[in-house]
From Swiss-Prot:
Keywords: Amino-acid biosynthesis, Aromatic amino acid biosynthesis, FAD, Flavoprotein, FMN, Lyase, NADP
Protein name as catalogued: Chorismate synthase
Gene: aroC
InterPro entries xref list: Chorismate_synth, Chorismate_synth_AroC_sf, Chorismate_synthase_CS
Enzyme class: lyase
Any Pfam family matching the protein: Chorismate_synt
A single MF term (Gene Ontology): chorismate synthase activity
NCBIfam families referenced in this protein's UniProt entry, alphabetically: aroC, PRK05382.1
Taxonomic classification: Bacteria, Pseudomonadati, Pseudomonadota, Gammaproteobacteria, Enterobacterales
EC number per UniProt: 4.2.3.5
Binding site for NADP(+): 48, 54
Amino acid sequence: MAGNTIGQLFRVTTFGESHGLALGCIVDGVPPGILLTEADLQHDLDRRRPGTSRYTTQRREPDQVKILSGVFEGVTTGTSIGLLIENTDQRSQDYSAIKDVFRPGHADYTYEQKYGLRDYRGGGRSSARETAMRVAAGAIAKKYLAEKFGIEIRGCLTQMGDIPLEIKDWSLVEQNPFFCPDPDKIDALDELMRALKKEGDSIGAKVTVVASGVPAGLGEPVFDRLDADIAHALMSINAVKGVEIGDGFDVVALRGSQNRDEITKDGFQSNHAGGILGGISSGQQIIAHMALKPTSSITVPGRTINRFGEEVEMITKGRHDPCVGIRAVPIAEAMLAIVLMDHLLRQRAQNADVKTDIPRW
């Protein structure tokens, strides 16, 4: 009921708030015998970590993860893995002025309507700080998928504001602060971010995540279709307002003769479906996109009300990302990895003995 857990066989439960003592999660369903250290998780956490560039929030959290359980002598035991990250750079005083004010565009109003109270410090549980634990759990899934099945999961920024980005060079993604795969657009992104900082405003973004090497057959029709669970996972990320699989909404303008992915003896001739047909993976690349809204934490004055119903004007103080899509890349990778690992374990549990003579590419 509380909505803090995702997955069925590979289950991730997170806890913690933005300005609490710590963030944590419990990861169930990890097979025994996997080599696992804190360093295996730290790489992706460092990619998501705040304060790593001038384009993201200057809250400086080391995000050093601790493995509390489920690993003995560097090997998973098959029991629950407990993970913890301590919060070290909270500045709760930045939020004392808004404890009775609902920030427009944030979850303040809805959390108070639901629970009758809220942790106003940095958004509490609704803060994207919670996603650090998703990234830690997702790193376990990414390691297992890569080592046992050769599955690779990569994400990148594919649009910021009105600047579209082409996936020209995956190796470039880790070499610039925008997770940008398009060398021709990095200067334009830098210029846009500088302008936003000067204006005190923010901008939306689009993130694309791709999984390669996924075997055919993952997905549980009808309600646990693979694309449905991917959409569920990506939509659960803060600020995400839309998810597309494959060509997504672009299929509206296509005809069936254009959209169908024809098959020859050499394999699929296109991938408009994004690697999923009938809710089941086809063996092609799984491609998903998500749209993230511009954060409402800006210094441009805006109208709202306080808890007494009085209209007030407010400016959001604190340290915030002018484009939340940048740090969402490793989060999207983690959520896709969590879903794929869960479905892979479910497929093996039910259909491990299934053999077909149908070609696979």
